[in-house]
Amino acid sequence: MTINHFALNAVDRSAELQGKGASRRLRKQNLVPAIIYGGGEQPTAISIKINELVKSLEFEAFFSHILTLNVDGEEHQVVIKDLQRHPAKGFPMHADFQRVVKGQKINMNVPVHFSGREEAPGTKAGGVLSTLVTDIEIVCIPSQLPEYLEIDVSGMEIGDLFRLSDITLPEGVVIAELELEDGHDRTIVNMQPPTVEEVDEAAEVDAADVPATEQGTDESKDGE
C-alpha cells in the first residue's frame, strides 16, 4: 500500500446474522464490521482487520481516494462514506463504503489545504487568518477525484475574504453547494485585523503624571 493506492482485505459476512451482538463479536476478534453499498447492487456486510484499517486511516488521502476492497478474492472499487469511532478511545467501530461505477459521478468530501499564509500581506501586518472549513463536498467522476483542494491565501490583505466560488477547481470538479438551487456562496477563509487588548489606563498611569506632592510623600515614606 502507498499513499496513492489503498487496498484492504475483507471477508463477506452477508450470510451471517447481523446486529449489535454480531458486531460486538467481530470487534472482540479485532475485526471491524463494515458495509459496501451502491452501484446498483445489494449491500454487502463485510469485516476488515482492525490493524489494516487503522494503518490506512493514518493517511489523509484515504478519505478522498478510490479504494480497493478485496472481498474473498473479488475486488471492489469503493470510497469511504462514513466511519464510526469509539467516542473515548477513537478506534474504528464501523465503516460504510460506496461502490464506484466508472463514469458515474460521486459526491465526496475532500480536505482543504491553505497555502501561503505566512507570505500573506495581512499576516505580515499582524492580521489573523481565520479558516472556516476543513473539507468541502465536491461532485465529479471517480477518475477526476482530487486528493485535496488547495487554496492560495498568499495575496490576502486584512479584511479580505475567500468564498467557495473563488476556489480554482480541477477539471471536471464542481462544488456541491454551488450546484444547489438554494446554495449560497459562503465564506471559507478571511483575514481578520490584529486582536487589540484593552489596557486598563488607570493601572498604567505613568509616574511622571503623578503630582509632585504625591511623589514627595511616597519618597518621604521610603526614607523613614
From Swiss-Prot:
This protein's UniProt keywords: Ribonucleoprotein, Ribosomal protein, RNA-binding, rRNA-binding
Q: Which SUPFAM superfamilies match?
A: Ribosomal protein L25-like (SSF50715)
| InterPro entries the record matches | Rbsml_bL25/Gln-tRNA_synth_N, Ribosomal_bL25/Gln-tRNA_synth, Ribosomal_bL25_b-dom, Ribosomal_bL25_C, Ribosomal_bL25_long, Ribosomal_bL25_short, Ribosomal_L25_dom, Ribosomal_uL5_bac-type
Q: Which top-rank group of organisms is this from?
A: Bacteria
Q: Which GO terms describe its molecular function?
A: 5S rRNA binding; structural constituent of ribosome
Oligomer status and interactors: Part of the 50S ribosomal subunit; part of the 5S rRNA/L5/L18/L25 subcomplex. Contacts the 5S rRNA. Binds to the 5S rRNA independently of L5 and L18.
Q: What does this protein do?
A: This is one of the proteins that binds to the 5S RNA in the ribosome where it forms part of the central protuberance.
Name used for this protein in its record = Large ribosomal subunit protein bL25
